């Protein structure tokens, strides 16, 4: 809720400072995240009702009718823009499903407290080609029986339609990474979203120098970009800057 409220405030500030324009970069990032979670148009009124109920509970009498009307207008301006972008992103996919089944075909320890999972499709659903730097959502049941989603960068073979590769770092206080690393084994089937991501290697034929700056497990999208460049035999000049707590 805090992230959502912050995004709406940033959107409002942009409208005030740049009349007649939209914050395209911010909207694109949010839209890619939404589509990776399977968010659809029908859910926006539900979000609106709950968000504005929470605002009223916290701010009380400060939320006058005029204030409520102003922020309602901002919310729906932002929502309508996102809905349009998200419909476009969904239409670009090879299937119309939010989640498809993928089978774990390999599970490999990678560095310090990280594991690389390799998946192949568990059925004949057409699959989309991802982009280096992009990500997929993983959805699985956690200990309380509820389904949780997390996004993981494609760390290798991002453009494949027959394989997905992600590298997961263990977050001992988390819900999803411990379940993946400790409970999911080769042969298991889990749900993945279609690939999304707004910071990707768009122009694979470019010869312009490329700088990649990463830290920790954030190396994974950069690894996918390097893999894609290597696969196409690119002679592009690349500078990788990486910081980590361990040489492992």
Model-derived regions, located:
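Alpha-helix initiation and capping sites
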Residues: 2-5, 130, 148, 216-219, ...
């Amino acid at each position: 809720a805090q992230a959502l409220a912050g995004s709406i405030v940033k959107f409002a500030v942009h409208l005030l400072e740049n009349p007649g324009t939209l914050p395209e970069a911010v909207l694109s990032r949010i839209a890619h995240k939404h589509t990776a979670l399977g968010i659809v148009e029908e859910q926006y009124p539900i979000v609106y009702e709950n968000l504005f109920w929470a605002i009223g509970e916290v701010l009380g009498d400060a939320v006058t009718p005029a204030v409520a009307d102003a922020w309602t207008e901002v919310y729906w301006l932002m929502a309508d823009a996102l809905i349009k972008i998200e419909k476009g992103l969904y239409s670009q996919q090879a299937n119309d499903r939010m989640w498809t089944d993928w089978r774990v075909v390999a599970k490999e320890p990678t560095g310090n407290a990280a594991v690389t999972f390799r998946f192949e499709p568990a059925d004949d659903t057409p699959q989309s080609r991802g982009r280096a730097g992009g990500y997929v959502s993983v959805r699985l049941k956690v200990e309380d029986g509820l389904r949780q989603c997390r996004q993981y960068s494609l760390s290798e073979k991002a453009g494949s339609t027959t394989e997905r590769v992600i590298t997961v770092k263990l977050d001992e206080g988390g819900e999803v990474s411990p379940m993946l690393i400790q409970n999911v084994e080769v042969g298991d089937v889990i749900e993945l979203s279609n690939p999304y991501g707004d910071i990707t290697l768009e122009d694979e034929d470019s010869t312009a120098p490329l700088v990649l700056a990463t830290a920790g497990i954030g190396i994974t999208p950069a690894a996918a970009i390097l893999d894609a460049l290597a696969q196409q035999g690119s002679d592009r000049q690349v500078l990788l800057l990486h910081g980590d707590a361990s040489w492992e």
